[in-house]
C-alpha cells in the first residue's frame, strides 16, 4: 500500500510547523490526550493532515454533524488523493425512531429513508479498513452506534482468482450468505445476476460491477464493468467481495439467537403478567413471535437490530460492536470541534436509553433491545489509544484530560482576527441595515445571528422588504438544502444569511466580511464564551472582517471573547511585522465547500427534455442528442426509469428527424452507438430486448 502522503500546493507556514512538530513528538512519546487550540483560518485541517503523514497510522476523524464531516471529507480527499479516505455518517435521509408516548397512548413506528450513496460510502470505509493500512475515515457520531461484528464482516469475504476451480452453485450460495440478492432484472448494489456461464456481482461499496466468466467450474476470466453499459473497465486477476450488509447473520448463531429470544420472551412475559400488565404482555408476545417467525423463514426481519445482542452472542450490558472495533488498536483519533463533539458523544447513550426503556416497559420490545445502543462515554474512552482534540475553544473535558495544549494562532495568510465593536441595541435594526448596505456595495456577504426563531424570521422578512437579498437558515433545513444555501451565499445569489445556532462551527465562508450578533449580552449557551468566539471566527477569513455586537452591557462572556480576539490579533500583527507579511484575503473556489458535501447526499437531478426537433439545425440536433443520451444514462443510474423512457422516446424522435438529413456518414456516427446504449437502458429496467424483438414494455 502507498504511504500516507499529503499533496498540497503549499508547505506549512505560520504556527503550523511548530504545531505539527509538537503534536508528532507528543504522539511518539506516548501522550494519550493532546489539544490543538487553533484559531479560525489558521489551517488546522492542514496541520492534522501533516501529522497523519508523519505518524503513518490509520486515523479516525470525528465531527459533530454531517455537513462538517462532509467538508472535512472533501478536504482530506484533496490532501490524500493516493490513499483511502472514507466517509462514515448516518445513512438516513429521513429517520423517525421507534417510540411510544404513554401520555397519549401513541406508538410511533420506525420510519427510515436510506441514502444509497452514503450507504455505499459506509461500506467503502469499512472495507478499506480490512484491505489497506493507509486509511483515513471521516465520521460523525454514527461511529459509536452499533455495527455488525468486524470478525463476521471481515473473515467471510468471498475471494476469487482467475484460473481457480470453484463450484458455481457454492459461490452463489456464499453470495446469498453474504446478504446479496439474486436479481437478473434490476442490477444494483448488493445484487448479483447469472447469465449462462457468466456471473455478475455488484458490490455494496462500488460504482462498478465484477463479471466472472466460467468454463465449467473454472474461472476463465474476471473483469470490472460498467453496470449500465456493460463496458469493460479493467481486467482482474483476483477479487474480494465483502458482505452487502454490515450485520451478517450466521446460520448457527441465528438458531442459537432464536432460542435465546424465546427464553427471554418467556421470562419477560412472566415479569409483565406478575405486575398485572396483561395488555403489555399480550402485545410483546404477538410482536416477538411474529418477528421470530419471519427470522426463521427469511433469516431477517424488520427491526432485527433490536435483537443484536443475541445475534452477536453478547451478554447483557456488554459493549456493542461499533466502527471503532474495525480499526487496529494503535489508530489515531482526531475529534474536530471537540468542545461540541465530546459532549455530544457523552450524551448519546442517555437519550437512546430513555426512549427504549419506555418501549420495554410498555411491551413493545424485549429488554435486550436496550443493548442495541451507542457506546457509553466510558466505553468510548477505552477505545482511545491516542487522541488529538481540535478546537478554537476547547471545552472542560479537553482541559481536564489534556497532557499537552498546542496553540496555532498565526495564519499563514497574515489575516488578522476581525475587529469587534459593541453598539447599543437602541435603533439596532436600522444601524444594521446601514452596515449591510455598505458591505453589499463592496461585494461581500453578511451573517446575522439572533437568539430566537421568531426574531430571525421577522428580521429576514424586514430585510427583504428593504430590498436586501436575504435568506434564513434554520434547524428544519435538511443537509442538502443547507449546502445549497451556503453555496448560494458564496456565489452571491443572496447577500445576507440570518440564523440562530447554525452560524458557528465549521462554516468556511471567505466572502463574509461582517458578522452581526444581536442580543449579545443575553445570558445562555448561545452567548457563552465559546459560542461568541466561534461566531466571531466566521469573519476571520475576510481581510476586512468585522464583528458588531449589539448589547446594552458587556457581559463576562463578551469581555472574554473580545479580549481573546484582541490577543490573537496582536500576536498576528507582531508576526506580520517581523516577517514583512502583507495580509491577504482567503480565495477559495466555491466547489471546495460544496462539491464534496453534495456528493455524499445528492438527490436525483431534474432531467431536461428537448425542444421541437423540427426547428433545429443538424448541428443543434447532434448537441441535443448527446445531451439527452447523458441524461438518459443518469436517469437510469438513479433508477428514474420513467424519465429514462421519456428521454429514450425523445432520442428516437431526434434520430428520425436526423434521418431526413441526407448526410449518411454523420447519421451513422450518431445513430449506431446511441441505439446500443438505449438498449442497455431498456435492459436495466428489467425488460429484455432480443434480436430486435421487445418482450414487455418499459
From Swiss-Prot:
One of its GO terms (cellular component) is excinuclease repair complex. Residues 622-657 form the UVR domain. Forms a heterotetramer with UvrA during the search for lesions. Interacts with UvrC in an incision complex. GO terms for biological process: nucleotide-excision repair; SOS response. ATP binds at residues 38-45. InterPro entries: Helicase/UvrB_N, Helicase_ATP-bd, Helicase_C-like, P-loop_NTPase, UVR_dom, UVR_dom_sf, UvrB, UvrB_inter. GO terms for molecular function: ATP binding; ATP hydrolysis activity; DNA binding; excinuclease ABC activity; helicase activity. It is found in: Cytoplasm. The beta-hairpin motif is involved in DNA binding. This is UvrABC system protein B. Residues 428-594 form the Helicase C-terminal domain. Residues 25-183 form the Helicase ATP-binding domain. A motif (Beta-hairpin) lies at residues 91-114. Belongs to the UvrB family. Keywords: ATP-binding, Cytoplasm, DNA damage, DNA excision, DNA repair, Excision nuclease, Helicase, Hydrolase, Nucleotide-binding, SOS response. Pfam families: Helicase_C (PF00271), ResIII (PF04851), UVR (PF02151), UvrB (PF12344), UvrB_inter (PF17757). PROSITE patterns: HELICASE_ATP_BIND_1 (PS51192), HELICASE_CTER (PS51194), UVR (PS50151). The UvrABC repair system catalyzes the recognition and processing of DNA lesions. A damage recognition complex composed of 2 UvrA and 2 UvrB subunits scans DNA for abnormalities. Upon binding of the UvrA(2)B(2) complex to a putative damaged site, the DNA wraps around one UvrB monomer. DNA wrap is dependent on ATP binding by UvrB and probably causes local melting of the DNA helix, facilitating insertion of UvrB beta-hairpin between the DNA strands. Then UvrB probes one DNA strand for the presence of a lesion.
Amino acid at each position: 500500500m502507498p504511504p500516507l502522503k499529503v499533496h498540497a500546493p503549499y508547505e506549512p507556514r505560520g504556527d503550523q510547523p511548530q504545531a505539527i512538530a509538537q503534536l508528532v513528538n507528543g504522539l511518539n512519546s506516548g501522550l494519550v490526550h493532546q489539544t490543538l487550540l487553533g484559531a479560525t483560518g489558521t489551517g488546522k485541517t492542514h496541520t492534522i493532515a501533516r501529522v497523519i503523514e508523519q505518524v503513518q497510522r490509520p486515523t479516525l476523524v470525528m465531527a459533530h454533524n454531517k455537513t462538517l464531516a462532509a467538508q472535512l471529507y472533501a478536504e482530506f480527499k484533496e490532501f490524500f488523493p493516493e490513499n483511502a479516505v472514507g466517509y462514515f455518517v448516518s445513512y438516513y435521509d429521513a429517520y423517525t425512531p421507534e417510540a411510544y408516548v404513554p401520555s397519549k397512548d401513541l406508538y410511533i413506528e420506525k420510519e427510515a429513508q436510506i441514502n444509497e450513496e452514503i450507504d455505499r460510502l459506509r461500506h467503502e470505509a469499512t472495507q478499506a479498513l480490512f484491505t489497506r493500512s493507509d486509511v483515513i475515515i471521516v465520521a460523525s457520531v454514527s461511529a459509536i452506534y452499533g455495527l455488525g461484528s468486524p470478525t463476521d464482516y471481515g473473515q467471510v469475504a468471498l475471494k476469487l482468482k482467475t484460473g481457480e476451480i470453484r463450484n458455481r452453485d457454492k459461490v452463489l450460495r456464499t453470495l446469498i450468505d453474504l446478504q446479496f440478492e439474486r436479481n437478473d432484472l434490476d442490477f444494483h448494489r448488493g445484487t448479483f445476476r447469472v447469465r449462462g456461464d457468466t456471473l455478475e456481482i455488484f458490490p455494496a461499496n462500488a460504482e462498478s460491477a465484477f463479471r466472472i466468466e466460467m468454463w465449467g467450474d473454472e474461472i476463465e476470466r474476471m473483469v470490472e464493468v460498467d453496470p449500465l453499459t456493460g463496458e469493460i473497465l479493467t481486467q482482474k486477476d483476483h477479487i474480494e467481495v465483502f458482505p452487502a450488509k454490515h450485520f451478517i447473520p450466521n446460520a448457527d448463531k441465528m438458531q442459537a439467537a432464536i432460542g435465546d429470544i424465546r427464553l427471554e420472551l418467556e421470562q419477560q412475559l412472566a415479569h409483565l403478567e406478575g405486575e398485572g400488565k396483561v395488555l403489555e404482555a399480550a402485545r410483546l408476545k404477538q410482536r416477538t413471535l411474529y418477528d421470530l417467525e419471519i427470522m426463521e423463514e427469511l433469516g431477517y426481519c424488520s427491526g432485527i437490530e433490536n435483537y443484536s445482542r443475541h445475534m452477536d452472542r453478547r451478554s447483557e450490558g456488554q459493549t456493542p460492536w461499533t466502527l471503532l472495533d474495525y480499526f487496529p488498536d494503535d489508530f489515531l483519533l482526531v475529534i474536530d470541534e471537540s468542545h461540541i463533539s465530546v459532549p455530544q458523544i457523552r450524551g448519546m447513550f442517555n437519550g437512546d436509553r430513555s426512549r427504549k426503556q419506555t418501549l420495554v416497559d410498555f411491551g413493545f420490545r424485549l429488554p435486550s433491545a436496550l443493548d442495541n445502543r451507542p457506546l457509553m462515554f466510558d466505553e468510548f474512552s477505552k477505545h482511545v489509544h491516542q487522541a488529538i482534540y481540535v478546537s478554537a475553544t476547547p471545552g472542560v473535558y479537553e482541559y481536564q484530560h489534556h497532557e499537552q495544549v498546542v496553540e496555532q494562532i498565526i495564519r499563514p495568510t497574515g489575516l488578522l482576527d476581525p475587529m469587534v465593536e459593541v453598539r447599543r441595541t437602541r435603533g439596532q435594526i436600522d444601524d444594521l441595515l446601514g452596515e449591510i448596505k455598505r458591505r453589499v456595495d463592496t461585494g461581500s456577504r453578511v451573517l446575522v445571528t439572533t437568539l430566537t426563531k421568531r426574531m430571525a424570521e421577522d428580521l429576514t422578512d424586514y430585510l427583504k422588504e428593504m430590498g436586501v437579498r436575504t435568506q434564513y437558515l434554520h434547524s428544519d433545513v435538511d443537509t442538502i438544502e443547507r449546502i445549497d444555501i451556503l453555496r448560494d451565499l458564496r456565489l452571491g445569489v443572496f447577500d445576507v444569511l440570518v440564523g440562530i445556532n447554525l452560524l458557528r462551527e465549521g462554516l468556511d465562508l471567505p466572502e463574509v466580511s461582517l458578522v452581526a450578533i444581536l442580543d449579545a449580552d443575553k445570558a445562555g449557551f448561545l452567548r457563552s464564551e465559546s459560542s461568541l468566539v466561534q461566531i466571531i471566527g466566521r469573519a476571520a477569513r475576510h481581510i476586512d472582517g468585522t464583528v458588531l455586537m449589539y448589547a446594552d452591557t458587556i457581559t463576562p462572556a463578551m469581555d472574554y471573547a473580545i479580549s481573546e480576539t484582541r490577543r490573537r490579533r496582536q500576536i498576528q500583527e507582531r508576526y506580520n511585522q517581523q516577517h514583512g507579511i502583507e495580509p491577504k484575503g482567503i480565495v477559495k473556489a466555491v466547489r471546495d465547500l460544496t462539491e464534496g458535501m453534495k456528493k455524499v447526499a445528492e438527490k436525483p437531478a431534474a432531467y431536461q427534455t428537448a425542444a421541437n426537433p423540427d426547428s433545429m439545425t443538424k448541428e443543434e440536433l447532434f448537441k441535443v442528442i448527446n445531451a439527452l443520451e447523458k441524461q438518459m444514462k443518469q436517469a437510469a443510474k438513479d433508477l428514474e426509469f420513467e424519465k429514462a423512457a421519456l428521454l429514450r422516446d425523445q432520442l428516437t424522435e431526434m434520430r428520425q428527424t436526423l434521418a431526413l438529413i441526407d448526410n449518411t456518414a454523420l447519421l451513422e456516427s450518431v445513430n449506431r452507438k446511441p441505439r446500443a446504449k438505449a438498449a442497455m437502458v431498456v435492459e436495466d429496467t428489467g425488460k429484455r430486448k432480443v434480436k430486435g424483438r421487445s418482450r414487455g414494455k418499459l
